[in-house]
Structures are given as structure tokens and as C-alpha cells.
Regions:
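Non-catalytic helical/linker scaffolds that mediate oligomerization, partner binding
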Residues: 1-472
Length: 472
């Protein structure tokens, strides 16, 4: 069983029912819906196909709605793409003008108030660099430092500039409401700056009467500076290395990745490493050696999941890419598991009752050579606490909630199942016997270590560890 999870971005390359079934069988655990592209009708159809494919394969597949976020962009050019050359003058304006080689509008009307002379402006993921020379009313006049081609709706980044945009744009609010009504299991918030950004998402969720975990995409320098508070406030993190490497020193991004992975594991929050993991497989049938190392090192660092973007959504080899990534992940896990239980912070003890019970369960399973860990969980927290120790035993999570089952598809080592509500520990034991016997990986007499709360079904009451011999 592969423990680490694979997140696949959906798109035209994997849009049919048959392709989605193949993607799941190849190793997809979470389907990412990128709300930067596509209409609500397209997403709805894709969602229904994912649920149908998941049902056919019998797998728990999480649906992640990734909001576009308040991305600052250029408006449009009257005659298509233009090429800027070093030394050219170029104006970005808040006025509605047809774009050309000398001027273009922007979606962000607060730009003139946020920038000043000498500020750096990056366009198209940093491929074009401008320097502000003057702010004149609605016009931000710049000079081109590094030239290149720019075109409609290309992104604008402002390294070192505090931008006064809301956490959610109007489009994000509409997309969030739609995604919740559609039935998504998780939501990713783009361009998070601090812990308070999650409040705006929760407000909309409360209005819709449905809360799901919110994943913080760390891609702004402010989020790096506030990473401990961000990890504490959100339900998980995506290390979005693409935009982060535009505004943050490129050479420091690997260290940010390692710090975030460690921090998330310590707090039992799932963490996804994303962007350019298998980029060459958009057009090639094999990854580069560097890409294989990148994926493996993310797993060795302790990431719960690795993510594919264009590789799976528009690439030429989406199924092969997932299969290849899965092989790399399994090989890295062999190395990881050979090291035994992974301490969170050497010498430090768990701070909570639930954390202490989870650690005890993992250590008992390790000492006794147990075949599995079993978590009865309503919210998924018990399973996530077990997951962070990276035990050799797979974690079987039993929950009455289908949403929790799908959300746990993002957590390392967890295989989740929807089961009827149990009223006592005796019923738990009976359920474990009947459910695990259905799985080919368990046999009569195998040792499993169970953890749950008593009374059952109450969130936050994990207080029990039980050693059980299957069928005994």
C-alpha cells in the first residue's frame, strides 16, 4: 500500500469517465478542480464524472476546490501579444484602454496607491521585469529591466509590496458558494497572507451552512513570515512553489518547503508539495532525474501529498505521469519506513490528550509488530494524529461521515471507510473484525491497535487504546 497521496489537477486531458477511472487506478487520491479555468457548468459535469468513477473503483477520492484568489492581472491587448525589450517604457493603468506595446490596463484598481518609485513589478511568473519610475494618477509608469512577451490576462507580481486586496475576490466568493453546493470535500485558498484570511472563507461557509477543511496555499512572502500562525489557523497547507518563487528568493524556497512540512506534521495538518514536480512529462513520457529526486525528497521530508498540475490536466501523458510518480513515491517510502517511527520534535512530548493517545497507539503497534492501526473518528482528527508519526502500519479510519472519509484521502497512510455508528467498544471490536476481514491485507489472528473516543461519536474525546487480535 502506498502511504503518501497524489493530488491530480483535472482538465481536458482526463475528462472522460474512462480516463478518470484510469487516473484513479493509476494512483490519484485527490482530484483538484482549478477554478482559475472553466465554467461552473464544466466543473459540475467533471464533478459528477469523478464521483461516478470513484464509485466504480470503490476508492475514496477527495475533491479539492482550488480558488483563483485575488490575482493581479493585466487586461487585454488590442492586437494580441506584444514583446517588450530592455529599456522600453511601459505604463500599467487602471483606466479602460486598449493594450499595446506602451500601455495596458490592470484588474487591480488599487495599484497606483500601493506602488512607488523604484518598486519592482514582475509579469508572467517573473519572466518580464519592470521598475516603477513614476506614479501619475491612474498610471504606473515603468521601465523594462528584463524583456519578453506579454499577453492578455498575464499575472502581475509585486515583490516586497504590501497589496491591499481582500482574501476573496468577487469571483472567489461565487466560486466558493458553487463549490460548496456542488459537494467539494476541501477548499484551497490562494495567496494567503496571514491567519485571518481563513475567516473570510469560514464566513461564506457558514452562510452556506457547510464547513469543509480549508487549505492555505503558501505563495506570498507574508505567509512565509506568518507560517506558524497560518498553519495553526488553517486545516492544511499547500506549498505552492510557483508564485512563491516569483516573489520570494528562489534559493530559499526549498528551506521554506522543509519548514512548512515539519510544522504541518507537528500540528497534524496535511501538507501538499506542489508545482513543477513532473513538469517535463507534460510533453515527455519520462521525467528528468531532477524531477524524480524532487518528488522523492518531498516524501522523505514528510509531505502527506505531492501534486500534479498541467502534467495531468493538459499533458500528453497524464496516466503515465501518475503511475511514474507513484513508483517514485513508493521507493521513497521504503527508505522513510526503514527509519521507524518519526518523532515530531526529538525530546518533546505531545501536548494534548488525543496526541498522547495517538503516540501511544503507534508505539504499541511498533513494539508488538502490529499489522494495522484503527481509528474511529468523526472529524478525522484521530486518524491525522496517528498519521503524523509515519508508522509502518497502515491506518484504517472508520467514520460515519462520507465527507470525512473523502477528506482523509489527503492524509498520509490513511485508508478510510464509511461504517454504521457504533454505540460501545464491544460493537467497535465486532465492526473491526468484520471490516478488516474484507481486506486482503489482514488475516485471522493479526494484531491491530485500535484508538477511539468513549463515548463514541463525540469529537475531541479520543481517550482509548486497545490491542486486538482479529477474530479473537
Amino acid at each position: 500500500m502506498r502511504r503518501s497521496k497524489i493530488v491530480c489537477t483535472l482538465g481536458p486531458a482526463v475528462d472522460s469517465h474512462e480516463q478518470l477511472v484510469s487516473l484513479i487506478e493509476a494512483g490519484m487520491n485527490v482530484a483538484r478542480f482549478n477554478f482559475s479555468h472553466g465554467s461552473h457548468a464544466e466543473h459540475q459535469g467533471r464533478y459528477e464524472r469523478v464521483r461516478s468513477a470513484a464509485q466504480e473503483t470503490g476508492r475514496a477520492i477527495g475533491v479539492l476546490a482550488d480558488l483563483q484568489g485575488p490575482k493581479i492581472r493585466l487586461e487585454t491587448f488590442a492586437e494580441g501579444p506584444v514583446e517588450l525589450e530592455r529599456g522600453d517604457e511601459f505604463t500599467i493603468t487602471t483606466e479602460d484602454v486598449p493594450g499595446d506595446k506602451s500601455i495596458c490596463g490592470t484588474t487591480y484598481k488599487g495599484l497606483p496607491g500601493d506602488v512607488s518609485k523604484g518598486d519592482q513589478v514582475l509579469i508572467n511568473d517573473g519572466n518580464v521585469e519592470l521598475r516603477v519610475v513614476e506614479v501619475d494618477g491612474p498610471n504606473v509608469k515603468t521601465i523594462v529591466i528584463e524583456g519578453g512577451v506579454i499577453s492578455d490576462h498575464k499575472g502581475i507580481n509585486l515583490p516586497g509590496t504590501a497589496v491591499n486586496v481582500p482574501a476573496l475576490s468577487e469571483k472567489d466568493v461565487d466560486d466558493l458558494r458553487f463549490a460548496l453546493q456542488m459537494g467539494c470535500d476541501l477548499v484551497a485558498l490562494s495567496f494567503v497572507r496571514d491567519a485571518h484570511d481563513v475567516n473570510d472563507v469560514h464566513k461564506i461557509m457558514d452562510e452556506e451552512g457547510r464547513r469543509v477543511p480549508v487549505i492555505a496555499k503558501v505563495e506570498k512572502p507574508q505567509a512565509v513570515e506568518n507560517m506558524e500562525a497560518v498553519v495553526a489557523a488553517f486545516d492544511g497547507v499547500m506549498v505552492a512553489r510557483g508564485d512563491l518563487a516569483v516573489e520570494y528568493p528562489l534559493e530559499r524556497v526549498p528551506m521554506v518547503q522543509k519548514r512548512l512540512v515539519e510544522l504541518c506534521r507537528r500540528n497534524a495538518k496535511p501538507v501538499i508539495v506542489a508545482t513543477q514536480m513532473m513538469e517535463s512529462m507534460i510533453t515527455n513520457s519520462r521525467p528528468t532525474r531532477a524531477e524524480a529526486s524532487d518528488v522523492a525528497n518531498a516524501i522523505l521530508d514528510g509531505a502527506d501529498a505531492v501534486m500534479l498540475s498541467a502534467e495531468s490536466s493538459v499533458g500528453a501523458y497524464p496516466i503515465e505521469t501518475v503511475k511514474t510518480m507513484s513508483k517514485i513515491v513508493v521507493a521513497a517510502e521504503e527508505e522513510l519506513l526503514s527509519k521507524g517511527l518519526q518523532p515530531l520534535v526529538p525530546g518533546k512530548k505531545p501536548r494534548t490528550q488525543g496526541g498522547s493517545v495517538a503516540r501511544a497507539a503507534c508505539e504499541i503497534a511498533d513494539f508488538l509488530g502490529g499489522k494495522g492501526l484503527v481509528a474511529f473518528t468523526k472529524s478525522g482528527d484521530t486518524a491525522r494524529r496517528l498519521s503524523r508519526y509515519r508508522a509502518a502500519q497502515p491506518i484504517q479510519a472508520f467514520t460515519t461521515d462520507e465527507g470525512t472519509r473523502n477528506q482523509l484521502s489527503l492524509s498520509w497512510g490513511v485508508e478510510s471507510h464509511v461504517v454504521p455508528f457504533v454505540h460501545s467498544t464491544d460493537e467497535m471490536v465486532e465492526l473491526v473484525d468484520s471490516e478488516l476481514r474484507k481486506l486482503k491485507s489482514f488475516s485471522e489472528g493479526d494484531i491491530v491497535v485500535m484508538t477511539a473516543g468513549s463515548p463514541p461519536g463525540v469529537t475531541g474525546t479520543t481517550n482509548m487504546v486497545r490491542v486486538h487480535h482479529l477474530g479473537g
